[in-house]
């Protein structure tokens, strides 16, 4: 949105910082014309490489903001996947897989390489990345920032960790034994502060296919509460 140059290839050379629309957007065209070579093609046997992957970098997982430090904490998914266009011959009228009123994804992404994660502290006023914590697994959970300058984040291997709000160095961790995809919350009772997080989540195949150590992970649903 800031109009700065970006790596890789996209359907547009950039975004208009005022409107948020592609700079080559034509309001009078019925169909927008993409940059040549930016769309998928059947000419590449391996498919078209997309970076970040279809689920990342930043997805729906909630970010958090520390107003005292002026930092935004963003959980990200690091990695790429491939999109391959395959000719579809069997459609509804031929008895194919597309059925009325049933969900159809049109295919699934190919993720031949392992996906990782990262936690970033960003100055939202300038876009400058102040700190980065590289993570072993993709981030599927949200972030919590506290007034005590701690940042909490759960991970796919069941690790629930606290990081320093300035450096993002890990300060504490505890493995709950089940994947974490929920954002933690904090509250106080009689002057005592607590942090709670729901655990237990579906193991997404595109993640565990290249992380075999996660295949035997339990997916029990539980609520964990920690005191500060």
State the predicted function of each range.
Residues 1-228:
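Beta-sheet-rich non-transmembrane sensory/scaffold domains
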